[in-house]
């Protein structure tokens, strides 16, 4: 018995399903356990080296164990790792975010993307004094009650339409419409405008594969929000700092009222950010009536890692390397995978996905028609050949500054070999 299997047998008695996040159980026949990581490489407890295209599901845009991040974390640990008071690094990281996102005047640091979207929605409701929100079918905004309705991601992989334990009274306040369908958004928004607090959207869907917005779609959301008095919330937990320093809102030229960030902004440590216009943000406690608090908010180690990461991103080379790697692998998927099995490949900057067996994917319903079995087989065959991609087409491939030419060439060889044995 290998060590990963041995550990999983123990874990099944300790954790529901043997894991602490559902997607980790999707690796078959059982999850592998990681001992260490560096650059673009994971090393399992059994000594197997894997090129990593999951990167912690997005945060590690510099790759694993980047020396600048490691140095910053070590320096902070030597000064203490939890104060329960304000500290200088939270100011420095906030200043960076405000400088990169013109829509953001102020921020509140929290501890996860889930906390960020939960706080943003509560804030929108408190500010507008309205209750309903519009979300998009297949957009994932974390694991809290308001957004566990047609939520994509691991929910999709395991075939669960929502979640048990969410009261119907709560889910009724969440109105779900198809992504990229302006007409549907406008209809639902205007029918509910007297009680519509917010429209929340992943500007690029990243938890139903990778689905970009159609030309003008996000600008139409801005218009509809303005006309109905709702706040527009961009959930940039994935796209923030991945599509560029200014995220999706800079790329597509649309200014939201509130933005949520996470993943990259913590440099690989737990983090969430809510940011927006001053007059909205000041509704948060202690300056306003909308409650938010947290023992670990603006954790010093996270702030150090995030600041080091963003300092490195400002140098520019990270985006050049990561985007180039993504372009090459996505092109290979188009030339080899699509040629054999059909489908489409979507890439936005350094995130991409192949949807086998479908002609177009503009929304979650389209994504559900893709051949999940072929996608899972590719995951399995690449894993045998030393490449780790997410075990679900409802996730994305991610690249980093560590995915240089040698890493990409090894990936392309493994991809060609894997596709030959899939039928």
Swiss-Prot record:
Keyword Cytoplasm: yes
Enzyme's top EC category: isomerase
Chief place where the protein resides: cytoplasm
GO cellular component: cytoplasm
Modified residues (N6-(pyridoxal phosphate)lysine): 263
UniProt-listed Enzyme Commission number(s): 5.4.3.8
NCBIfam families, A to Z: hemL, PRK00062.1
Name under which the protein is recorded: Glutamate-1-semialdehyde 2,1-aminomutase
Taxonomic source organism: Ignicoccus hospitalis (strain KIN4/I / DSM 18386 / JCM 14125)
């Amino acid at each position: 018995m290998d060590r990963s299997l041995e550990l999983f047998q123990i874990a099944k008695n300790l954790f529901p399903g043997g894991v602490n996040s559902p997607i980790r159980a999707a690796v078959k026949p059982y999850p592998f356990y990681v001992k260490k990581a560096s650059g673009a490489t994971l090393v399992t407890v059994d000594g197997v080296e894997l090129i990593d295209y999951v990167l912690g599901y997005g945060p590690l845009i510099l790759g694993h164990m980047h020396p600048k991040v490691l140095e910053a974390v070590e320096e902070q640990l030597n000064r203490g790792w939890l104060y329960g008071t304000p500290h200088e690094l939270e100011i420095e990281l906030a200043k960076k975010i405000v400088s990169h996102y013109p829509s953001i005047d102020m921020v509140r640091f929290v501890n996860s993307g889930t906390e960020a979207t939960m706080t943003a929605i509560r804030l929108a409701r408190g500010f507008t004094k309205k209750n309903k929100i519009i979300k998009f079918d297949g957009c994932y905004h974390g694991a809290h009650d308001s957004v566990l309705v047609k939520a994509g991601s691991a929910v999709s992989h395991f075939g669960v339409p929502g979640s048990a334990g969410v009261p119907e009274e709560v889910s009724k306040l969440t109105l779900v419409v198809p992504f990229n369908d302006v007409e549907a958004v406008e209809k639902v928004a205007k029918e509910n405008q007297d009680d519509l607090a917010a429209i929340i959207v992943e500007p690029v869907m990243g938890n139903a594969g990778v689905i970009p917005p159609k030309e003008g779609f996000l600008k139409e959301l801005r218009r509809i929000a303005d006309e109905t008095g709702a706040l527009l919330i961009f959930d940039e937990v994935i796209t923030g700092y991945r599509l560029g320093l200014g995220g999706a809102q800079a790329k597509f030229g649309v200014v939201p009222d509130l933005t949520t960030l996470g993943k990259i902004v913590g440099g690989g440590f737990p983090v969430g950010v809510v940011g927006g216009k001053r007059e909205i943000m000041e509704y948060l406690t202690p300056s306003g009536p909308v409650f938010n608090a947290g023992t670990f908010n603006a954790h010093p180690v996270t702030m150090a890692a995030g600041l080091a990461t963003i300092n490195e991103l400002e140098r520019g080379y990270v985006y050049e390397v990561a985007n180039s790697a993504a372009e090459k692998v996505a092109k290979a998927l188009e030339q080899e995978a699509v040629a054999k099995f059909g489908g489409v490949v979507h890439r936005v900057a350094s995130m991409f996905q192949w949807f086998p067996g479908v002609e177009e994917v503009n929304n979650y319903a389209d994504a559900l028609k893709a051949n999940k079995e072929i996608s899972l087989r590719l995951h399995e065959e690449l894993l045998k050949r030393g490449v780790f991609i997410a075990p679900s087409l409802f996730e994305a491939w991610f690249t980093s500054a560590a995915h240089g030419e040698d890493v990409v060439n090894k990936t392309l060889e493994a991809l060609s070999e894997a596709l030959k044995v899939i039928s």
